[in-house]
């Protein structure tokens, strides 16, 4: 009788019993560089600063007019001064506060001015071509139009969400009889103010 071959189960058991090599350490996630208001050089003129201060004061809800706004008002003040930061940008320059801090934490004008300077320097405005290309994705028939209902849904639910009233204001008079919107004409309309 020939000698028995070793059973593969034993070899498998030996392989399984061998210590597994240590997993490679996970790469450290990239961290957002924190916004440092002290590092921002203010380039505004004295007249501009006075104008900004006046607008800022309109948002001040403190009982004694302390020239303070809540974190939640910061984006509104920036937009009132002609900037268009995303909500994410506003949260980043505020140090990513918790949602419950947005209406309790405040900042004064001296803290706000570097934020305004930073946001005004770092505008990333899309071009006409960028917006047309973005809307072309929704042009299923490649005829230069998008469905108004679909555009309404996208504007109200994706990215920087708009309210239904804002969407209606934006799209008033843009749809044809079939409920379609010529997106090149729409982008020209939006970019003209």
Swiss-Prot record:
Keywords tagged on the record: Methylation, Motor protein, Muscle protein, Myosin, Repeat
Gene Ontology MF term list: actin filament binding; actin monomer binding; calcium ion binding
SUPFAM superfamilies per the UniProt record, alphabetical: EF-hand
Region (Disordered): 1-36
Database matches in Gene3D superfamilies: EF-hand
GO cellular component term, pick one: A band
Highest taxon of source: Eukaryota
Example of a GO biological process term: regulation of the force of heart contraction
Protein name: Myosin light chain 4
Lineage, top ranks: Eukaryota, Metazoa, Chordata, Craniata, Vertebrata
Gene (UniProt): Myl4
């Amino acid at each position: 009788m020939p000698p028995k071959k070793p059973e593969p189960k034993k070899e498998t058991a030996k392989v399984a019993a061998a210590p597994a090599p240590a997993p490679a350490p996970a790469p450290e996630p990239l961290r957002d560089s924190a916004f440092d208001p002290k590092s921002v050089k203010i380039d505004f003129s004295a007249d501009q600063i006075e104008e900004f201060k006046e607008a800022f004061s309109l948002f001040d809800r403190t009982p004694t007019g302390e020239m303070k706004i809540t974190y939640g008002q910061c984006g509104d003040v920036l937009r009132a001064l002609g900037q268009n930061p995303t909500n994410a940008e506003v949260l980043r320059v505020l140090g990513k506060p918790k949602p419950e801090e947005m209406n309790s934490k405040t900042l004064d004008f001296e803290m706000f001015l570097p934020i305004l300077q930073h946001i005004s320097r770092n505008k990333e405005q899309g071009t006409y071509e960028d917006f047309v290309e973005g809307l072309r994705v929704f042009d299923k028939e490649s005829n230069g139009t998008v469905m108004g209902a679909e555009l309404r849904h996208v504007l109200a639910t994706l990215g920087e969400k708009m309210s239904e009233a804002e969407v209606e204001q934006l799209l008033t008079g843009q749809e044809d009889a079939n409920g379609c919107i010529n997106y090149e004409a729409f982008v020209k309309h939006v970019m003209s103010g």
